[in-house]
A protein has these predicted regions:
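Conserved Radical SAM active-site core
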Residues: 1-67, 74, 79-90, 257-260
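Surface-exposed cleft-lining segments at the edges of enzyme active sites
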Residues: 63-71, 99-109, 147-156
Length: 260
């Protein structure tokens, strides 16, 4: 696997330029996958290398509609999710239902039922649900693939998205997950905008890694205690609560990587 080799190479299909990524100084990896089961056997190696991680697990349910070919059955993927959490911890595996796709066979009601089924089974195993609405008309390749496979899609309207988000927030009252959208311009009450690479989460998970924290420009402070009048100072708006009776703040970490 590429970590043992020490680097990865990628050739840009448009201009033929080859780029290299070195893993010599890697401290943290964020994984995205619809089927991260093969990763489980490599997690101990990451630990040996002192490389921390979290996983964005796209756990959808389009099984009956055969829209995601090549992924294992839903029950297997839910079991994989739980095995990953047992290995890594609840905060390190994020549930994504992405994208939310409407067809003549999949109504908003049916989508909510699919989400509820998975959400009920993941209670106690995740803290967060990230979702996005399939923007089919914007992505010609997606539109072409759906039409090629005779899948009669329905594009989301703003009114439909707002209503769906409202109903999902209501549904979430029994789970209390953090709800967040991915790549959506619209805002919805009770739903945050997700970060693809969430530096706040990385800090919360890897606050003991001084090298990484220095790179992320993190400063830590003791949690405020009551003064002689019993008053407790308010935390800053950007405070990240750590598990060691401290909180952290950080600088602007946007796009620290170099693109060749």
């Amino acid at each position: 696997h590429r970590l043992k080799v020490g680097y990865s190479a990628w050739t840009n299909p448009f201009n033929g330029v080859k780029s290299y990524v070195s893993y010599q100084n890697t401290r943290f990896i964020v994984f995205w996958s619809k089927n991260p089961a093969p990763l489980i056997s490599h997690l101990d190696y990451l630990k040996e290398r002192n490389i921390d991680c979290y996983i964005q697990f796209s756990l959808n349910d389009y099984e009956k509609e055969h829209l995601e070919r090549g992924v294992p059955p839903l029950h297997f993927r839910i079991d994989t999710f739980k095995r990953l959490v047992d290995k890594l911890g609840k905060g390190r595996v994020i549930w994504r239902f992405d994208p939310l796709l409407l067809t003549t066979d999949i109504s908003p009601d049916k989508l909510l039922q699919k989400i509820e089924n998975i959400g009920d089974q993941l209670q106690g195993y995740t803290e967060k649900l990230v979702f996005s609405f399939a923007d089919i008309l914007t992505y010609r390749k997606v539109k072409s693939n759906l039409e090629k496979n005779n899948i009669p899609y329905i594009d989301w309207t703003e009114e439909m998205m707002c209503d769906f988000a409202r109903r999902l927030v209501q549904l979430n009252k029994k789970w209390n997950y953090q709800l967040a959208t991915c790549g959506e311009k619209m805002s919805f009450d009770g739903v945050a905008h997700n970060h693809c690479i969430d530096d706040n989460l990385i800090i919360r998970l890897a606050y003991n890694d001084k090298t990484l924290m220095d790179f992320l420009k993190v400063k830590t402070y003791p949690m405020p205690t009551a003064d002689i009048f019993g008053e407790i100072a308010e935390l800053p708006n950007d405070a990240i609560i750590l598990p060691n009776s401290q909180y952290a703040t950080h600088g602007n970490n946007q796009d620290k990587g170099q693109r060749l």
